[in-house]
Curated annotation (Swiss-Prot):
Protein name per the record: Acetyl-coenzyme A carboxylase carboxyl transferase subunit alpha
Family note: Belongs to the AccA family.
Keyword Cytoplasm recorded: yes
UniProt cross-references to Pfam families, sorted A to Z: ACCA
Molecular function, one GO term: ATP binding
Gene behind this protein: accA
Catalytic activity: N(6)-carboxybiotinyl-L-lysyl-[protein] + acetyl-CoA = N(6)-biotinyl-L-lysyl-[protein] + malonyl-CoA
Domain CoA carboxyltransferase C-terminal residues, every copy: 40-293
Keywords: ATP-binding, Cytoplasm, Fatty acid biosynthesis, Fatty acid metabolism, Lipid biosynthesis, Lipid metabolism, Nucleotide-binding, Transferase
Organism, as annotated: Marinomonas sp. (strain MWYL1)
InterPro entries in alphabetical order: Acetyl_CoA_COase_a_su, ClpP/crotonase-like_dom_sf, COA_CT_C
Origin organism lineage: Bacteria, Pseudomonadati, Pseudomonadota, Gammaproteobacteria, Oceanospirillales
Amino acid sequence: MNLDYLPFEQPIAELEQKIEELRLVGNDNELNISDEISRLEDKKIALTKSLFSNLGAWEVSQLARHPKRPYTLDYIKHVFTDFEEMHGDRHYADDRAIVGGIARLDGRPVMVIGHQKGREVKEKVLRNFGMPRPEGYRKALRLMETAERFNMPIVTLIDTPGAYPGIGAEERGQSEAIAFNLAVMSRLKTPIISTVIGEGGSGGALAIGVCDELMMLQYGTYSVISPEGCASILWKSADRASDAAKAMGITAQRLQELGFVDTIIQEPLGGAHISHEEMAQSLKKNVLAALDRMEALTTEELLARRYNRLMSYGL
């Protein structure tokens, strides 16, 4: 099993393996098998289109967690320039599960903030698997208030399984930190554009997700609990995660139907991990368009629009 492919992608993985084997045979024997390789590559593209045209919520959830999916720092590298990271909450520590700082987006100064997961074991531990502690949310809020002070729009990138549930985090006021962020973000006098680039896990996502426009990547998810967690509660078994994912309506398409998501950003065929650069440029285009829409409003119009947006949830 190719670990770069998810379980539902194994038919694609098998075709890819055949293509690689043919390439090796051709190289070793100087045979011209390019026509057969081209035929298999066309078949692979057709199969990928077929599989990805009818994905269920559980398959989307797996894609949202793909280990090679671009993370916040990848987007900062490809989308922004002159990024200057800012550290610490000025109270306790610097939470590396949240990254943020001043950058330029197409020449315009912005404050960019996002969750950051890790790829290798050491980085995963350093980033706490993308699960922020209270100091991470307080750092994010400090950066947002700085952005407001200097009239810079805020761009947030959401990708977390949720806020860290450890005892230390609870003792330092995890719920208070999240709630305070929600309250302050609702009245910041600067545009806020948020994008779910992977997992949007409950309050851990909302704490940097109160915004004027919410976008989601095509294979992102947003939910109050993971499918496995929901299945464990309802059916006492994580094996029914697929049923839970479908019932919760966690996909971008379903959330747009419910009026929660404004824009769905299409991903490359096969998912965002197939081409970080292509995905980043699509994200950049959509963020710039959203900023143009929000910066055309007066401060009073912006705040009224944000308030009405928040009050409309659940109606």
